[in-house]
């Protein structure tokens, strides 16, 4: 038991990342039923589709689950309203200023964690009053911060900059990686790609097979001129 498991009411300090196109109700409920924290990825869902996934997830598990919400999305007001209406108790926010919604969510009894790519942003999260911070290094899939700080450099930097409960993310997919993150000061981990390749994930079977066939040196960057987006992970073969 630590601050992360106590905060979210979970057995293990493992959070399944809320990935677009991958993290629907089947994956989130499976992770929650296994003792972790499953997250629905709202970023790829129409607001009413999100409502449907929340209801199906609640029917599939009686354990805590949450929703990951990128704050930059144009339908953010409608998404937040649905989250509140459906009684979601945990929200992970990213891609925006946590001050914009943290107070509103807290007023409705919702726990808030925010994803950051630097210790500077972690301090802003503490000022905004979030309940936990996710330190996401450049190894993470999806859209990352422009700092390009690697996960195991970022963890101690954020740990030294804030007193918030700390979740590490980015390139973590094995027990050894979880242990290393904890040694550096994390109290929990957020894992994405590893869960994206499970049967419960809604990712394309072709994508899953592709990732499972990768080896050392196969990590690739796509669309970097638009946004830092590393894909394809070598640690999955460990």
What do the predicted segments below correspond to?
Residues 39-45, 137-145, 178-204:
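Glycine-rich phosphate-binding active-site loops on the catalytic face of alpha/beta enzymes
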Residues 154-156, 160-162, 182-184, 191-221:
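Conserved catalytic cores of soluble enzyme domains
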